[in-house]
């Protein structure tokens, strides 16, 4: 059976950040995205005009993660100091700062099912906060290493959290009962950090990326390893599915983005400096937009890169 092929077209490279770009989330509409990074600024970009929008927020520390919650019209930004800045997008002002982490905030995600947002920190803590009061509800110490990434399975109502000690913990979304935990990445006998967790949109698989440069596929039914792929040359930092869930992309410290078939887990395209306009440094974050199937990547080279991906 012939492997499906895809076309990747470079649309634009957007410049404006003066430091590494670590954070990205969807914007006010499908054609806008927020970005943030070491220059301490949050920018808003338009994927249609390929220009920066008239929006800018300056924070007192480098930004590792941003989370746009359109239902509340707020933007959350986690920084290297452990602060979570909450911006009211209607009022265009900061309305609150949460400081429950004692290390950098690596990830912020939210769930309308629980009306909460969730944060993962370099202090090994995982926190649950109310979307109504914007205050801390629960704090769990998960590791003496970092808590790096959070993912929701909407089908099974589970939360996965990736830890720097290589463990991935699975919690019940509503009760936070620990349902499973396993070592996700190791090289021989040595365990290495898990950087990113991402559920497949159908809820059947959990994908993890680690410091070992491997992409691991786990069955959600029992969290047993189905496949381990030496996907990159350096650590994997992000995984993003395309809108129809037939493809996914991985981003790595090795400066590349790779596009994979979501059924066969075969690599379909390698985006490197050899064959594309590509990042010159670590690629940190991906968004696969519903707008024209654009795959957006950001990295340590300060660039926001936009590519259109279509099946041939």
Task: Set out the residue ranges of the language-model regions.
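WD40-repeat beta-propellers
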Residues: 42-45, 84-87, 126-129, 168-172, ...
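Blade-level signature of beta-propeller repeat domains, shared across WD40, Kelch, NHL, RCC1
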Residues: 282-312
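Residue-level detector of Asp-centered blade-edge/turn motifs that repeat once per structural unit
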Residues: 28-29, 70-71, 112-113, 154-155, ...
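WD40/WD-repeat beta-propeller blade N-cap
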Residues: 14-21, 56-63, 99-105, 140-147, ...
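Short loop/turn segments that connect beta-strands within beta-propeller blades
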Residues: 47-50, 89-92, 131-134, 173-176, ...
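Conserved strand-to-loop turn within each blade of WD40 beta-propeller repeats
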Residues: 36-39, 78-81, 120-123, 162-165, ...
């Amino acid at each position: 059976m012939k492997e499906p092929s895809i076309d990747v077209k470079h649309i634009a490279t957007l410049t404006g950040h003066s430091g590494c770009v670590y954070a990205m989330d969807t914007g006010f509409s499908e054609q806008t995205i927020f970005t943030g990074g070491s220059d301490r600024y949050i920018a808003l970009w338009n994927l249609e005009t390929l220009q920066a929008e008239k929006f800018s927020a300056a924070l007192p520390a480098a930004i590792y993660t941003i989370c746009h919650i359109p239902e509340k019209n707020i933007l959350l930004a986690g920084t290297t100091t452990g602060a979570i800045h909450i911006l009211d997008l209607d009022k265009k002002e900061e309305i609150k700062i949460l400081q429950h982490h004692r290390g950098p905030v690596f990830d912020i995600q939210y769930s309308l099912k629980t009306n909460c947002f969730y944060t993962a920190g370099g202090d090994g803590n995982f926190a649950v906060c109310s979307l109504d009061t914007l205050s801390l509800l629960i704090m769990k110490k998960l590791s003496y290493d970092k808590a790096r990434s959070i993912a929701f399975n909407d089908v099974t109502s589970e939360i996965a959290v990736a830890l720097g000690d290589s463990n991935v913990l699975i919690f019940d979304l509503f009760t936070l009962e620990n349902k499973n935990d396993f070592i996700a990445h190791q090289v021989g006998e040595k365990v290495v950090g898990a950087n990113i967790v991402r559920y497949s949109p159908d809820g059947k698989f959990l994908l993890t990326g680690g410091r070992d440069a491997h992409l691991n596929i786990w069955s959600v039914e029992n969290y047993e390893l189905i496949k381990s792929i030496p996907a990159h040359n350096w650590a994997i930092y992000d995984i993003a599915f395309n809108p129809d869930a037939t493809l996914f992309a991985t981003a790595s410290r090795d400066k590349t983005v790779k596009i994979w078939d979501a059924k066969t887990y075969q690599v379909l395209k390698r985006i490197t400096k050899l064959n594309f306009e590509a990042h010159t440094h670590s690629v940190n974050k991906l968004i696969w937009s519903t707008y024209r199937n654009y795959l957006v990547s950001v990295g340590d080279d300060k660039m926001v890169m936009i590519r259109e991906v279509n099946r041939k």
